[in-house]
Amino acid sequence: MVTPVTWMDNPIEVYVNDSVWVPGPTDDRCPAKPEEEGMMINISIGYHYPPICLGRAPGCLMPAVQNWLVEVPTVSPNSRFTYHMVSGMSLRPRVNCLQDFSYQRSLKFRPKGKTCPKEIPKGSKNTEVLVWEECVANSVVILQNNEFGTIIDWAPRGQFYHNCSGQTQSCPSAQVSPAVDSDLTESLDKHKHKKLQSFYLWEWEEKGISTPRPKIISPVSGPEHPELWRLTVASHHIRIWSGNQTLETRYRKPFYTIDLNSILTVPLQSCVKPPYMLVVGNIVIKPASQTITCENCRLFTCIDSTFNWQHRILLVRAREGMWIPVSTDRPWEASPSIHILTEILKGVLNRSKRFIFTLIAVIMGLIAVTATAAVAGVALHSSVQSVNFVNYWQKNSTRLWNSQSSIDQKLASQINDLRQTVIWMGDRLMTLEHHFQLQCDWNTSDFCITPQIYNESEHHWDMVRRHLQGREDNLTLDISKLKEQIFEASKAHLNLVPGTEAIAGVADGLANLNPVTWIKTIRSTMIINLILIVVCLFCLLLVCRCTQQLRRDSDIENGP
C-alpha cells in the first residue's frame, strides 16, 4: 500500500555512503535488511500532482553525465592551468542553458542564494579534494517541459567551450550553442584519457561546485528537490580526472591543448529509509487517467553503481491508511463480552440484529520493512473486497576536512537522522491518534471496522476505487467528511458505558424469565379466567336444556 512522492512534497532524506565526494547526510549501514532488497511488486496507483520519476521514460527526468571542475596550483612551466575534474551521473537538460533565452533571462523562479563564482573554484594539489558549495547560476536549465509539467534547475552546468571573443565567424563557437566536448561526457567507463585541442582558447562555462536542485514550476510551483541528484549520482561510479591546459605555437598561431587523465573511480551507494522506498522497473505514467502502473517491478531502499538505466525509479512512501466498504457475516460488536452476551440472548430470547455494510479503516501505520510493503502492494493491486483479504560514518573525511569540519559533518548527519526519526514518529502518532478515536470491532487487530453504515449513494464504488488508487482530487473532501461522520459515530458509542446495551438486554431477558413475574401474571388473570369458565359452563348447560326439551317434544308428537 504505497503512494508516489510528488513534486509538491517536501524533499526526502537520501543517505550516501561517502561523505568525501557527495554532500548531504551519510550512512554506510544501509540497507538495513539486504535479503529483502529487490522484492517483486505490482503497482497500480493514482496521483494528483506530478510524481517524481527518474529514467528514460515520459514523465521521468533523464540521466546524463555532468562535470565539476576546480583549478589547482600549476607546477609545470608549460601549463597555463592545472585542473581536477569530477564526472558523474546527473540530470539531463532538455535544452542547453544557453539556448532558451526566455527562461535564461527570467528571474521569476530564480531562487534566493549565493551567486556562483565568476572564476573557476580553487583547490589544493590533493586529487581527492572537492568542496561543494551551493550556488545559483546566471541562467536556468530546463529539465522537462511537456504534459507532465515544467521542471527547471538553477545549478551550474560546467562544460568546456571555445572563447570566440574577438574572433572571426570561423570560430567553432560562433553559433548560439558553444562547442562542447561531447566525448568527455559520453562514457564514464571507456575513456581514461581526454585531449582537447584548438587554435582558440578553452574556457569553462558555468563555474561553481554545486549540486542540481530541480523544482517544478508548472502546472504548480513546488519546492526544490536536491535529493534526486544523490540518487542519480550513485547509479554509476564517479570518475576523477587530473590534467592541465598548455599553450604552444602552431603555424604562427597560439594553439591550446587540454590533457585530462582519469586516475580514480569511486563507487557510491545512496539509500532512503522507511517509510520511503524505490520502485524500480518498467514504470508507465498515464497523465490522462492520472495513474501509474508497473508490473513485475522490484522494491529497493538503496541504489548503487550496478543500477541499469534501462529501468526507471519511482519514489514512493507507505500510506497511513484507507477506507474500504466491506460486508460482514455477523453484527458489529465493540468487545468480545458483548459478542458472547449477544449470542446467548439470541439463543434464549430469539433476538437478533442485522448489519448490512460497514466501513473498514485500514490502519497500517508505517511500513518498516520492504517485505511488508511488497505484500501490501500485491494485496492492493489484486483485490480489496472482503474483511478476510484485508486481513563507516565519516569515511576518509580527515583527508578532506579539518577536525572542526568533521565534527560539523557528524552533527549534520545526526541532525538528519533525528529529523527523519521525528517525521516517522509524527506519522506514527497521527496514525495511533486516529486509531484511538475510532470505536472498532473486537474481532480485528491490524485494521479497524467501524459501526458507520455504508451509504452507497454518497460514496459509490468509483469514488472508493479512486481513493484506493491514491488520487487526491475532490475525493479528499468527501473522505474528510466521511472521517468526521465516523468519529461522530465513535463518540456516540464512547458516551455509553461499554456493554450497557447488552447488559440491559440481559436484564430484560432475565426479567422475562423470572417465575415471580409469571405468578403475578397468573394472579392478575385468575378472576377473568373463572368468569370465562362460568360463562362457558352456563352456555353449555343452556345448550343441554334446549336439547332435552327438543327431544321431549319429538317424543310427544310421535307417541301412540
Swiss-Prot record:
Q: In which tissues is it expressed?
A: Expressed at higher level in the thymus. Expressed at lower level in peripheral blood lymphocytes.
Which Pfam families does this entry report, sorted A to Z? GP41, HERV-K_env_2
Induction statement:
Induced by type I interferons and by Epstein-Barr virus (EBV).
List membrane-spanning regions. 522-542
Map out region (Fusion peptide) in residue numbers: 355-375
Q: Which UniProt keywords apply?
A: Cell membrane, Cleavage on pair of basic residues, Disulfide bond, ERV, Membrane, Transmembrane, Transmembrane helix, Transposable element, Viral envelope protein, Virion
Q: Which InterPro entries match?
A: GP41-like, HERV-K_env, Retroviral_env_glycoprotein
Disulfide topology: none
UniProt modification remark: Specific enzymatic cleavages in vivo yield the mature SU and TM proteins.
Organism superkingdom: Eukaryota
Q: Where is this site: Cleavage?
A: 354-355
Has keyword Transmembrane helix? yes
Listed GO CC annotations: plasma membrane
* Gene Ontology MF annotations: structural molecule activity
The observed outcome of changing residue 348 to I is:
In allele HERV-K18.3
Q: What does this protein do?
A: Retroviral envelope proteins mediate receptor recognition and membrane fusion during early infection. Endogenous envelope proteins may have kept, lost or modified their original function during evolution. This envelope protein has superantigenic properties.
- Oligomer status and interactors: The surface (SU) and transmembrane (TM) proteins form a heterodimer. SU and TM are attached by noncovalent interactions or by a labile interchain disulfide bond.
What family does this belong to? Belongs to the beta type-B retroviral envelope protein family. HERV class-II K(HML-2) env subfamily.
Could you share any additional remarks the record makes about this protein?
Orthologs in P.troglodytes and G.gorilla.
Q: Which PANTHER family does UniProt cross-reference here?
A: ENDOGENOUS RETROVIRUS GROUP K MEMBER 113 ENV POLYPROTEIN-RELATED (PTHR34313:SF3)
Q: What is this protein called?
A: Endogenous retrovirus group K member 18 Env polyprotein
Read off the lineage from the record. Answer: Eukaryota, Metazoa, Chordata, Craniata, Vertebrata
Chain's gene name: ERVK-18
